[in-house]
Amino acid sequence: MQENIQNAIQQAIENAPERKFVESFEMAITLKDVDLKNPVNRIQEEVRLPSGRGKEVRIAMFAGSEMASKARAAGISVIDPATIEDLGGNRQQARKMAKQYDFFLSEIPHMGTVGRFLGVVLGPRGKMPRPVPPTLDPAMIANGLQSTTIVRSRDKVTFHTAFGSREQGMDELTANAMAIWTRVTSKLSLIHI
């Protein structure tokens, strides 16, 4: 399978026209003979890519005071918890924020407020924030998320996930694609790409 994936990546690189931006690589996976109407059969996995995503991941954190300064030091955008209620009342602004960031983190005391006011926007996009305990440095979580991609099938038999960018080498892209393939095949036995 590794050779097939490597050949597919090579073919995509050779056949792609020249662009004025750094292209991402996506893998399309089609499931066969799987009933996705049953939520147990759906795939929802976070895969840590061995060679990273090839692009910077945008992370935001709902935090105040001390945790906010730690987050800023780690390069994480900080959203003031006082604005959560205002964002919840302005759906357009909340959607814009959800589109702007790849992952969200939150201090534990703010999780309920985020769920109440922004859950309608963040939940369906799979972007509900991960809780950060007060003893944990948000930089550790952010470093892990920099090389993480989400594989989510929902109720569709064909789904896509990003696994790298044009700036990465063939071996890095192949390793990333194989990591996703291995994780998905461990969840299901009947898969065709």
Predicted features by range, described:
Residues 7-15:
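Interdomain regulatory linker/hinge segments that flank or connect interaction modules
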Residues 15-67, 90-91:
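Translation machinery proteins
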Residues 24-30, 42, 46-48, 78, ...:
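Residue-level preference for alpha-helix termini and adjacent loops
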Residues 47-109:
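Extracellular/luminal Protease-associated
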Residues 191-193:
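Conserved small/polar residues in nucleotide/adenosyl-binding loops
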